[in-house]
Amino acid sequence: DYAPTADAFQQESQKRIRELYMYDVLRADRCISSNSIEARVPFGDLDFVRYVMAIDPEKKLNSYGKGKYLLRKAFEGDWLPPEILWREKAAFSDAVGHSMVDDIKEYADSLYTDEEFQLRRANYSAHCMPFTKESLFYREIFEKYYYDQSRTIVDFWMPNKAWPGCNVNDPSA
């Protein structure tokens, strides 16, 4: 939604595809496999990905006022009812319900004073420093179980903050 140019959008899309296995795909695979279930990911089909990446990036920019515009247009007609097709995008974690995410944020806020947050986040300044109390909460859980393994996590899976207007700060997304 924030790409300043079509070329920047295409480059970011290529980067996301290259790194996808480290983020949502890995998380989904581990959660599903631990329950002896196999996932099918239709939008992960290689032919589909190649097709989408070959579309003119200018057409993929969010100049229509709605994210995922081309995907929504593809399912217009008899495929999906308009109230589903054109509803607001939701973060991956929203499927668990807003109340749970809000509860986690509230809990994380209660764990640390602002001063404690600044001091404790500084422990991780060398790599992927937490940027909210919630992200510090997640990081400390990670460190408890995977001590000194943070280098395996390349970066936060967040929108490109170098782009103008992009001030998303939600580790739950």
Which residues does each PLM region occupy?
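Adenosyl-5′-phosphate
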Residues: 4-173
